[in-house]
Amino acid sequence: MKLTKITAMAAAIATVAGLGAVAASSANAQVVTDGEKTITLNATSADQLTGHTFKVVKVASYDVYGTAPNQSVTLKTEDGLKTDIAKYLKYTGTGDPLAWAQQQDQAKLDKSTTSPWLGDGTTRGLADKLASKATTTVTSTLSNENKQATFTLDSPGLWLIVDQAVTGKSSKALPILAGIKLTINNTVYSSGSIDMKNQTASVSKTVTDQTVAAGQDASYTITTKVPNYVGYKVNGYQFTVSDKFAHNAPLSYKTDTLKVTVDNKQLTAGTDYTVTGFNSTSKTFIIDLSAYIKAKGFKGTPVDDSKFTDADLVGKNVTVEYKATVTGSTGNTGVANTPTIRYPNDPSNNESKQEVPGPRSRSEPSPSRDFHGS
C-alpha cells in the first residue's frame, strides 16, 4: 500500500536530517540494514572541521514497506532513546514515539535549512536533549581541501553527530541530526549530506586620518557582526567588543564621543550595553553587549537551563565609533588600534570563550574565526 498522507512533522524531521519525504509506520515495514553507511558534513571553511572530533548515537532506523514502485519510508526509533524522545515529545503511549509523531496532524518537530538553523526550536531542542547519549567516538575522513568530513557509521538511519572539540580557530558546533543516504526506486529520501552549520566571525577597523596633528582628534570605527547565540544558555552569555592602543600611544580617548549601533540602531549606554575604560587616562576599553542580546534573544525571565530562541539579532552589523585626541607625535603612520571581539564558543559552557583579534594594519578585516549554529 502506498500512503498518500505525508504529515508536516514527517517532512520537517526529514528536512532537518537531510531526508526527503517519509511517512507513518506500518506493520510490514522492513528495517534497512544494507547499502550506504556514510554521512558527510560540508563546511565553507577548513577551520570549521580541522582539529574537531565527534561522537555519535543512532536515533532511528529506516523502515521501508510496500512493494515497488509504491514503497514508502518511515523512521523507527532506537530502543535506547525511546524514553527520552517520548518524554520530549510528550508522548504517553507504548508505541514508537517518532512513528506516533509522524501521524499527528500538528507537527511535533520542525525544519530549518538556513542560518541560524533554529526553526521554531523543537528539533533543536530534541538534538540538545539527546546530545549526552552520543558516546561513540567516530573518525572522519577529510576531503575537498578539508571542507568536507565523511563519517562511516555502523548502519543506515538517522544519526546524531556531536562535536567534541573547541579549537583556536573555530567553536564547538551544536548537535547535528543527519540521515545516511537512502535511495529507493530512484527516489532520494536522504542525501547523506548536511551543512556543518558554522559561521565566520571577524572584526575590522578604519581610521579617518592616520596623521592627525597634536591637539586634534582622530576618528576610529570598529565593525563586526553579532555571533550566532541561538542554542546557547542565556544565563552567563557574554559578547564584548574591545579596543586597545599601545601603553605609550600619544592618544587620549575623548569622552562623550563613543557611539554603538546594532543594525543601524544607536544603543543606549547603561541600558543596552556597558562600557569600561573609555576615559582620558586609559588605553583600552570594553563594550559589553550581553544585556542587549539577552533582551532581544530571549523572552521572559531565564532559568538555569534557558537557551536563546529568538534569532533576530544573529548576523546583524555592530558598529563602534569614537574619537581620540592626539597628545604627541604620531609620525607618518599614525597610531594603530587593535579591536577584539569575545563570545562563548561552546554551547554547553558559556565560560569557554573565543577571542577574535582585529587586524594589525589600519584598515583590514581580521583573520576569521568560526562559530556555531545547528
Segments and roles (model prediction):
Residues G18, S25-Q48, A178-K233, S242-F245, ...:
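Serine/threonine-rich, low-complexity linker/repeat segments that form flexible spacers/stalks
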Residues A46-K87, Y91-A99, T223-T261:
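Low-complexity, serine/threonine/proline/glycine-rich extracellular segments that form mucin-like
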Residues M1-A29:
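Secretory targeting and sorting signals
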Residues T135-E145, V162-S202:
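Long amphipathic alpha-helical scaffold segments
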Residues T92-T167, V262-T325:
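Extracellular adhesion/glycan-binding regions together with long Ser/Thr-
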